[in-house]
């Protein structure tokens, strides 16, 4: 097992890999700020063996500078700050419409989210463990207040319970709805005719949102499930774009447009400004970034 290294030792390791460090003191300041391990993700595309993830030597292509990885890091940082606001908008709208539509469809059953006639059994089986008995739910004041007022209720009604579920649980709830017409109706509200296609859209948005929420690298994002593009709306995704950052942002823009065209316009404008600024400041890194992310500069 590797042992912890001082910042000076970290500098030595980076230099041994061929990374040019013109200002060691500034590099130390950055390593203390960002962290050696975190910054390592941004050196990866400069490695000779990239995109290979096994048997890596960590040696970089000649001419790679410390500032190159830092520039990618701050591009990611700025992109994350832009995306967070719009991802939240989509999450709230998705949660709201799913709750609204399903609660009206099953008016006589305020606990439709655990009803075997509405959702598949595996979701119901896991609901207590994953959702209702989670620490967040046990400490939630609104949920506690409901049960204090109605002690006989096993669960709070959908409009309370679903409001406090995690985005991941909401996505799983959508996929667990048994009636295909219900799923299709929710998908259509966001401009997608097929529920299977929409499930991949919302999966991509969820993955992107999680990366942003946890401060993880975005530029080389890979979607675990991919996006179904061929049978969905014409959004211009083919090949690798169905699994990369460009694909995730494309479906985010598409879904956001069906929530608010103005907000979609705002997001596109902010992205264009970020891309233009990056091109002006670090034009030599544009091709590397495009190769990793699929973004269209």
Regions found by a protein language model. Name each.
Residues 1-208, 219-297:
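Extended intrinsically disordered or low-complexity regions, especially N/C-terminal cytosolic tails and loops
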Residues 215:
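Acidic/aromatic/glycine-rich contiguous surface patches that form carbohydrate-binding/processing clefts
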